[in-house]
Amino acid sequence: STAMTSPFRFAHAAHAEWTQAAQACMLQLGAIPSGATLGFLYVSDAWVGELDAILAFFKSTTGVSHWTGSVGVGICATGVEYLEQPAMAVMLGEFAAAAFSVLPLLRPPRDIDAQPLEGYFALVHGDPANSRMQELIEGLGARVTSGFIVGGLSSSGSENAQICDGVLNGGLSGVLFSERVRLATRLTQGVSPLGPRHRVTAANKNVIGSLDHRPALD
């Protein structure tokens, strides 16, 4: 048997006021399943200062206490992309309690060895301001039995806030899942560490053409 048999409930909305967007999401979610145990919440960075209140709203209205997520400069939902406007996307999953655990925030790599981390794979969010993020990802990958990690980096014009039951930043956070949870993934974007400091020598808006007079993808 699998640890989750019901489909995810999900919703998304854009509005100038987060309260209106959150209410719209609740209407889309409908009746909250009694078995909902884990929430996923992604919010535009325009609302980073309100993230504590947004998370508290969804905790109280859904009754779900465990949450993961992040802020981003854009929000992708089912067939919709929100850019340059405040928006949010929320999803609820019905997982057996023993099938997942919220990952504590990991800042220096030694935090990985200090935690009793057990899981088959992990969904994670990383703060790009942490200079040791690659070490954290590799270290966590060595601890999950599949060696498989999915997720992405937080993005923001200000604070790279993440959701890990509460609101925090500065490291790697997420959820560990057991082998009882079925997994299907798609790669939407690949990135590589830039290494030392470079000078952008050619660009078109937000697309970098060359670094230090060399093709950017070299």
Question: What does each of the following model-derived ranges do?
Answer:
Residues T2-D52, A56-H66, S70-D218:
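Small-residue-enriched flexible segments
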